[in-house]
Amino acid sequence: MIEKIWFDNHILGKLMWPLLWPLSCLFKYVANKKKLDYFTGKKTAYKSSVPVVVVGNITAGGNGKTPVVVWLVEQLQLQGMKVGVASRGYGGKAPHYPYLLSNTTTPDISGDEPVLIKQRTKAHVAVAPVRSEAVKMLEEQGVDIVITDDGLQHYALQRDVEFIVIDGKRRFGNQAFIPLGPLREGLDRLASVDFLICNGEQPKTNEIAMTLEPSKAVNLVTGEKKSVSNLGELVAFAGIGHPPRFFDTLASLNADVVHTQGFVDHKAFEPEEIKNLMQYGEQLIMTEKDAVKCQSFAESSWWYLPVDASFPEEKAQQILNKIIEVKEQYGLSSS
C-alpha cells in the first residue's frame, strides 16, 4: 500500500498526509544533518587506498542497481582489474563483520544480492553494515578498485565515481521524502553525481539509457537453458523492489504466465510457500536474485531468468573511460 501512496497518487496518501508529512520532514532533517557533518569535517569519512565507485539511488526500493554493478565488474575485469564489491548485506546475518563471501556462502549469511554478484562475477565480495569496513577487507585482498552495491547515502565512505540508477517508469514518485514518499535525498542530488542511469523508458536530459536484456531461462536443478516462450505454462513470482517489472519482461518474451505473485524485496523464502505456488501450475519461473535463495530446495520444474544491463556503446565507453581515468590517478596499473 505504501508504494501506491508513493507512486500511484493513492487517496490514502492524502488521508495520511497529516501523519506522514512531519515524519518526512524529520527524515529529511536527519539525512541532511548526517551528510553535512561529513561535508563540514565534523565527522571524518574513510578514504580508501583504491578507487571507490558507488552505484546507488535516491529512492527507496529496487531500481536495477545490481545489474549495473555486475556489468561494471565484468567490464573492469576485461580491462585486467582485480575488482572488489562492497555491500551492506541486507537480509543476511553473518557470523562476524566484515565478512568475505566464499563460493559456498548462502543468502541467509550475506544477503541475496552479494551471493548473486559473487556467483556471476567470481569477484571478491565483502559485506558489513558499515560499508567502509567491507572496503577495508577488500583492500586486504589486494583489489585494484571497489564497487559498492548501494551506499550512495553512506557518507562515512569517500568515493571517486557516483552512479544514480533511476527507475525510468516510476521515476521519483510523488517526490516526497520517506515515509510520505520514496526519496532518501532531494532531487538536487542528481546534479552532483557522475552518471545518471535510466532503467527502461525514455531517458531525460543527461541520463544514460539502460535496458535489462533477458537471456534464456535456466533450470535451477539441471542448469538446462530454454527460451521462455518454449517452457509452456508458467507460474511467475518475484521478491524484488518492483515485481511488475519482472512480469512485464516475461510478457515481452511471450511467456505463457498463468499466475503471478509478488513478494517484498529481499524476502527470505520458506520452501513450503514457494512449493505452494505450484497449485497454480507445474512450472515456476523467478528472478535470478530469487533463485539464489531457492537453490537449496529447488525442484526440477523451477526456472530463473537472468538479465544483463546493456548500454549504448558510446555511453558504455564513456563510463569505462571515467573509471579508468580515476584509477590512473591513483597510480595503479591495470595490467
Curated annotation (Swiss-Prot):
Enzyme class, broadest EC rank: transferase
Residue sites binding ATP per the record: T59, A60, G61, G62, N63, G64, K65, T66
Family to which this protein belongs: Belongs to the LpxK family.
EC number: 2.7.1.130
Database matches in Pfam families: LpxK
Keyword Cytoplasm in annotation: no
The protein's name in its UniProt record: Tetraacyldisaccharide 4'-kinase
Family annotation (NCBIfam families): lpxK (TIGR00682)
Cellular component terms (Gene Ontology): plasma membrane
Presence of the UniProt keyword Lipid biosynthesis in the record: yes
Keywords from the named record: ATP-binding, Kinase, Lipid A biosynthesis, Lipid biosynthesis, Lipid metabolism, Nucleotide-binding, Transferase
Pathway: Glycolipid biosynthesis; lipid IV(A) biosynthesis; lipid IV(A) from (3R)-3-hydroxytetradecanoyl-[acyl-carrier-protein] and UDP-N-acetyl-alpha-D-glucosamine: step 6/6
Annotated GO biological process: lipid A biosynthetic process; lipopolysaccharide core region biosynthetic process
Protein task: Transfers the gamma-phosphate of ATP to the 4'-position of a tetraacyldisaccharide 1-phosphate intermediate (termed DS-1-P) to form tetraacyldisaccharide 1,4'-bis-phosphate (lipid IVA).
GO molecular function: ATP binding; tetraacyldisaccharide 4'-kinase activity
Cleaved signal peptide residues: none
Catalytic function, reaction form: a lipid A disaccharide + ATP = a lipid IVA + ADP + H(+)
Residue intervals passing through the bilayer: none
